Amino acid sequence: MELDTKDRQLLSLLESDAKAPAHELAQATGIPPSTVHHRITRLEQQGVIERYAAQLDPKQVGRGFAAFIMVTGSPEKYLDDDFFEHDYVAEVAAVTGSYDLVIKIECPGLQEFNEFLQQFREKYGKYVSQTVTMVCTETLVH
């Protein structure tokens, strides 16, 4: 599907605020509100917009501590639903380079992170040759 300039503008605005009213989107893009509505509906139907989600403040919901676990090995072949559905697992990405996976953990604090890491090593350690942990000190862009 080919996206034109107005589609890209709408998508950028919706990424910033998915609840922005059509009249604000119309004003920002210079197209009528009814056209905004039709374009958004088309983008949804074509799968460009997959879903709308709330961006939560991690501190407010008990996930003020964030860390990244860089993994070498092949645990992705053995990770199960328990892992992917764990409350602390925010993101998992297969990557190229020195590591095979990057796991983003968001949890209440250091103690909970250490407990999670210990459980991860116990359950998946035999599939992992190395982990490197980086604690997030500040989120610069969300």
Question: What are these model-predicted stretches?
Answer:
Residues 1-142:
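A compositional/biophysical signature of low hydrophobicity enriched in polar/charged and small residues
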